[in-house]
């Protein structure tokens, strides 16, 4: 976060103590002080906010281009089959027959996953609640817990899943076009990246389905943190699986 701020991106930087350390302990637990950021997240973004979010993600990718620390994506495509191994019964409990469908998806993704795309530091969780606006203007991104190295276009695909689906589960092509227009105003996607977006978006939906399925359990009385329902991303998987031709109407080329 400090690197991004030093390179012009609006990120909250950790505050150093008198000795220059940014990580300390409070009550025996690791702790850090982080700068305050202005702005607010939105639940129903406007088209201008979608364009701003897309531009903000490209800004992040460009600002992080020289970052020389690296972190493997432990929730990336190479790990999905292993993540699903202990979850077959949980998938079928969620929806009868779902395990076989997910196995078929995993095989398809493994067979068609791209290689050689531009790689760099990615946010990997660029959801609306991690992005701040003032009015329609993008002003900051937060929550870099999952930040890692991966295809830059995979980060775009994560965002398309997060920002461009309607509450009824349908994919909003107009929203996707706005997001991608904003992104490409700062960092144009290559032809290979555009061609890979459908499979990357399918894979991004798989990543969040699997992590949510891992965490899914009944909410205990008084529990403050409620797990996210994996069915949201099961429905997104179905869109990518059955309606990939709709996504492939290529809003990236608009």
Q: Language-model features: where?
A:
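ATP-binding pocket architecture of kinase catalytic cores
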Residues: 1-69
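Generic structural signal for conserved hydrophobic packing positions in ordered secondary structure
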Residues: 14, 32-34, 60, 122, ...
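Active-site acidic catalytic loop and adjacent metal/ATP-binding pocket
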Residues: 14-15, 107-154
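A cross-family kinase active-site recognition segment
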Residues: 43-97, 117-119, 224-227
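Charged catalytic carboxylate motif
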Residues: 52, 56, 101, 155, ...
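ATP/Mg2+ or Mg2+-diphosphate-binding catalytic cores
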Residues: 86-88, 208-254
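Active-site activation/catalytic loop segments of kinase-like enzymes and analogous catalytic loops
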Residues: 153-188, 202-219
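All-alpha amphipathic helical-bundle segments outside canonical DNA-binding/catalytic cores
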Residues: 189-201
């Amino acid at each position: 976060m400090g690197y991004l701020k030093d390179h012009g991106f609006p990120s909250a930087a950790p505050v150093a103590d008198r000795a220059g350390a940014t990580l300390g302990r409070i009550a025996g637990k690791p702790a850090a002080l982080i700068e305050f950021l202005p702005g607010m997240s939105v639940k129903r973004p406007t088209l201008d906010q979608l364009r701003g979010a897309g531009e903000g993600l490209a800004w992040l990718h460009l600002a992080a281009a020289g970052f020389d620390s690296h972190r493997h994506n432990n929730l990336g495509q190479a790990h999905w089959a292993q993540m699903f191994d202990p979850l077959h019964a949980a998938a079928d409990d969620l929806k009868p027959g779902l395990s076989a469908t997910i196995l078929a998806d995993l095989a398809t993704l493994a067979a068609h996953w791209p290689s050689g795309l531009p790689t760099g530091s990615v946010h990997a969780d660029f959801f609306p609640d991690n992005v701040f606006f003032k009015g329609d203007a993008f002003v900051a991104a937060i929550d870099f817990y999952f930040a890692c190295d991966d295809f830059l276009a995979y980060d775009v695909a994560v965002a398309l899943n997060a920002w461009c689906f309607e509450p009824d589960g349908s994919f909003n092509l107009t929203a996707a076009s706005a997001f991608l227009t904003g992104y490409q105003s700062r960092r144009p996607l290559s032809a290979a990246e555009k061609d890979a977006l459908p499979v990357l978006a399918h894979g991004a939906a798989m990543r969040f389905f699997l992590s949510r399925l891992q965490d899914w359990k009944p909410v205990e009385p008084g529990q403050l943190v409620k797990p996210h329902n994996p069915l949201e991303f099961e429905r997104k998987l179905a869109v990518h699986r059955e309606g990939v031709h709709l996504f492939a109407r290529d809003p990236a080329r608009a």
